[in-house]
A protein has these predicted regions:
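Anionic-ligand binding patches
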Residues: 2-4, 11-210
């Protein structure tokens, strides 16, 4: 079975290939000569993930899966949530400031730490949440994973991506996710949990019928 993973992120692609190695050949759209983007216009992780899966299914003509991830910070009422990748832009727009580039995670982290500084004494508990949408044989299936933790006071570590330098997972309370080896991070990651749930579903519902 061959599945398109709707991502251009090499780290995500490597993680998915490791988890699905015995079940499916995972290819990226770029490996099929597809470089178009699909707009993430949904208001929830589930909506965005299925929008991407549908879009790339149409572009590639193959069964497809896609993910969307958000960061939920309790002291900020669940923000940035589904808007994690453009949080700095959202806050700059709110405050009438110049807009930083899209997907600028250095600016996003600065904005997150700044917003939390306005909540002294509030718990810094947070979670990453990933939803994976699988479009297979015309049917849509969804899988979810979370990683619980807290937001650090400052950046540490150079690994990972996104908010990893300021996210401390409950499983490793003495370091940021950006300081964890890749294999350790993948073992506990929100996306990894969602992908493993998808792999288990494929094993139980597809492979047994082949």
């Amino acid at each position: 079975m061959k599945l398109v993973f709707a991502t251009g992120n090499k780290g995500k692609l490597r993680e998915a290939r490791e988890i699905l190695a015995d079940l499916a050949e995972v290819v990226a759209p770029s490996e099929l000569g597809i470089f178009d983007d699909v707009a993430e216009t949904g208001s929830t992780l589930k909506e965005n993930s299925i929008l991407k899966a549908r879009g790339y299914r149409e572009l590639c003509g193959m069964d497809c899966f896609a993910d969307d991830t958000g960061l939920e910070v309790d002291a900020l009422g669940g923000a940035p949530g589904v808007h994690a990748a453009r949080y700095a832009q959202d806050i700059a727009r709110r405050d009438g400031l110049p807009l930083p580039p899209d997907h600028d995670f250095s600016a996003n982290i600065d904005t997150l730490l700044s917003e939390l500084s306005k909540c002294p004494g509030a718990p810094r508990t947070a979670r990453f949440r990933s939803v994976v949408a699988l479009l297979l044989d015309g049917e849509e299936h969804f899988f979810e994973g979370t990683l619980e933790g807290r937001i650090a006071q400052a950046r540490s570590g150079s690994g990972g991506f996104g908010y990893d330098p300021v996210f401390i997972a409950d499983e490793y309370p003495d370091r940021s996710v950006a300081e964890l080896p890749e294999e350790v991070k993948n073992a506990i990651s929100h996306r990894g949990k969602a992908l493993r749930a998808m792999a288990q579903w494929i094993k139980e519902n597809i492979c047994v019928n082949q």
